[in-house]
């Protein structure tokens, strides 16, 4: 029966192996010097030579004619090659991974070899062993006799217990380069009389993805395509359902041109042709990386020779290629880890250049050269009177304080005017930071301590209460803030800050009032956003209700805070919505009060809002009666839009819990290039 190519041409000695030269050198020296450990761990991708090396090592330590390599002629070598050696045990750890199997192995370890010098245990797919099995191996591995060697082969090194790692030597088998795979495929094709072009071999090596075994399997498969003519690149693409270069470049051009209709049309065509999308994504990523390098450097040599003609015809900005690279990586598993090492480095360079381009200015680094100070000249001593500095008659004025003109309130009710004054920036409430003020030497009375929400704490309140916290619901503590600007008159000078002290009390940041949020949201209310958020909320409530009926406890695990999610399931409706906030109506007053406070102070609560509504939002929640008494009148008195509430603090709050950005790079590309669904250009 004919052997498949990867079995027929599997290396049987060290000199036949490719791509793992450093590992080969270390192991050969260890065998020659008789300094083998009790165990080896071989980790790496499939088809990189782990099991092959293990079997060659088993021959090497038992070879009767060892001279830097195995002879493949002695009794030991031939027995191992034919899989009939009774002292070499090749175990499939994926199927024999139970504690009973390991106990049986441990009992036999201390028996002397029957025929050879050493016994070898090769455990393939070792990461499949159970924790109990690993525990059973610990003592055996540590106290193994000198005539026993363990070799663990795995594709998932991270699953090997640290206690095992500390008792073995670990080697990481890298993927075989495309050049080495192509060279080996050419040698095998010549020996098997397979007529195939160089371009076809290059494509097969690329399809192998660093696995020499996969490359030989692909060559074996394509060898049956035709017995009479030479196999070409087109034959390979047709056999394995691959895109030709015209189709790949056509797709990239459609995407980067913003032609959504053509892009979707091409994808549908690819699907009807049975295209291998797994390989297509990997090729698309690698090709886009090369095109970015070409456009950025102007050097066509960075693109593969077969793609250079098509690459020269494209006319796109490097930023567009960078965005496409990020979109593929963010939405699929085909990022840099699937590329060759050189392409991985190129992808890193793209990410760095793209990040640097967003920075407004990065100053050049100038190294500080330390020089030896010259010897000081002798200065005659002066009397105390002579040494006094001569002060000017009057210090020049560097700054003066002016008052910004007051803006008349657009709300008749003075209390409402305090509520709807909006912040310049927002301070996280629980931070309890203290705000230092610029010294005002011209003022006789203490200036009102201003917060960052457009309100000021009344001076008499500051004098009476000092540093004690203020109630956010009591509006009698506050008055409209007077903004003070520092304006340079002559030359700039450092601003002197007053340090906080008992004689100079400073303001304490206050929490946002939910009425403030509600009025701001209403000032920017968008009916489309109301419908959008209501739809998201209804969908969430349906799933939540269904999970409660079926007692599906796993449903709530997807949310950062199950209590916040449970509260939100009791919303009656979305009353108003803006890009930065929501107004929600509840029946339960306790839930409404608790929810808006937690949304401002609790990272898990804000993260749950982000998970349900898909963006960070200020939340204002009421019962219907509360809304009518606290907000409705103020909303009706609005004469112009209030300021927008900034979301930076909420984003920082939720980012401590939610690790992934909600908006992917693919969505960024869609926003940039796709100007509407199925639009004609």
Curated annotation (Swiss-Prot):
Its EC number is 2.7.7.7. InterPro entries: AAA+_ATPase (IPR003593), DNA_pol_III_sug/sutau_N (IPR012763), DNA_Rep/Repair_Clamp_Loader (IPR050238), HLD_clamp_pol_III_gamma_tau (IPR045085), P-loop_NTPase (IPR027417). One of its GO terms (molecular function) is DNA-directed DNA polymerase activity. Keywords: ATP-binding, DNA replication, DNA-directed DNA polymerase, Metal-binding, Nucleotide-binding, Nucleotidyltransferase, Transferase, Zinc. Gene3D superfamilies: 1.10.8.60, P-loop containing nucleotide triphosphate hydrolases. DNA polymerase III is a complex, multichain enzyme responsible for most of the replicative synthesis in bacteria. This DNA polymerase also exhibits 3' to 5' exonuclease activity. Belongs to the DnaX/STICHEL family. This is DNA polymerase III subunit gamma/tau. It comes from Mycoplasma pneumoniae (strain ATCC 29342 / M129 / Subtype 1) (Mycoplasmoides pneumoniae). The lineage of its organism: Bacteria, Bacillati, Mycoplasmatota, Mycoplasmoidales, Mycoplasmoidaceae.
